């Protein structure tokens, strides 16, 4: 697992674009899920995370190990950068990038 400390990190910026832009989601064929419940629901439905971003606090959650094992790439981020990936006031500490499934 790698650590990201800069808000200028390319992977972090790419994930943040998925949150902010429908066009980015369509072009990249990916979406960003926030929170353990949404990420675990996606995982249980058969989607595998391409990237998982987790804060130190988020690593304490019981489902963290399962998400990190399933993810292609995993990153630890500080709480200050979690706000960049969140549209909530208090980020839950875990964010996963998934491929948009074909219907």
Give the positions of each predicted feature.
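Glycine/small-residue-rich loop that forms an oxyanion/phosphate-binding "nest" at active or ligand-binding sites
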Residues: 67-99
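Boundary-proximal intrinsically disordered activation/regulatory segments immediately upstream
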Residues: 1-63
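Nucleotide and nucleotide-moiety/phosphate-recognizing core
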Residues: 102
């Amino acid at each position: 697992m790698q650590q990201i400390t800069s808000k200028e990190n390319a992977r972090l910026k790419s994930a943040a674009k998925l949150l902010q832009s429908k066009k980015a989601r369509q072009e990249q064929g990916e979406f960003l899920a926030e929170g353990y419940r949404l990420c675990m629901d996606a995982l249980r439905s058969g989607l595998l995370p391409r990237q998982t971003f987790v804060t130190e606090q988020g690593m304490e959650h019981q489902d963290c190990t399962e998400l990190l094992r399933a993810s292609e790439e995993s990153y630890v981020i500080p709480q200050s950068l979690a706000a960049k990936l969140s549209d909530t006031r208090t980020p839950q500490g875990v964010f996963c990038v998934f491929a948009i499934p074909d219907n």
